[in-house]
Amino acid sequence: MIKKIFGALIFLSLSTALAFAVDDVPLPEVILTGLQAYSMKGPEAALNAWTKGGPLENDPKVLGSVRVFQEVEKYYGRYNGYNLIRQKKLAPNSKLIYLQMNYEKGPLFIRFLCYFSGDQWVVSGRLVLNTEPDEVLN
C-alpha cells in the first residue's frame, strides 16, 4: 500500500513539474526581432517589428501601445532584458508566448498570440501587457 502511495506521489510530482516546465523551443524570430528593436530603438520600433507581416500591421490601435511602454519606462526605469515564462502550443500553427520584460524597478508581463503563416511566425492577436502578472498569465 505504501509503495502505491509513494509511486503515485512521484508520478504526480513529475507530472506537475512537466506541466509547468518552460519548453526549450526557440522563440519565433518575430518576437526576438521586436525585443532587439525595443532595446535599441524603443517601443515604436518593437511594435512595428512585432506586427510586421501579420494582420495587425499598421493598425493604429496597436501603435497606441507605445504609450503603455512609455508609462512603464517612466515608472519602472530602463529596460534590462527579458525572461521567457512559457510557450503554450495551441495547435501545430499557433501558440501563446508569455514573457517578462525586465526594467530597473520591476517587470512588465506580455502575451503574444503567434501564428505560423506560410513560412514564418507572425503576431496575429492583440498584445496583452500589464505590470500585474494575473492580467496576462491566464
Please place each PLM-identified region on the residue numbering:
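Positively charged n-region of N-terminal signal peptides that target proteins for export
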Residues: 1-4
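Exposed beta-sheet edge and beta->alpha loop/turn motif
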Residues: 86-138
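Sec-dependent N-terminal signal peptides
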Residues: 6-10
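Short solvent-exposed beta->alpha transition segments
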Residues: 44-93
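Solvent-exposed, acidic/flexible segments
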Residues: 23-28, 39-40, 58-65, 105
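Residue-level recognition of short, well-ordered coil/turn positions
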Residues: 42-43, 120
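Short, low-complexity N-terminal intrinsically disordered segments enriched in polar/charged residues
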Residues: 12, 17-40
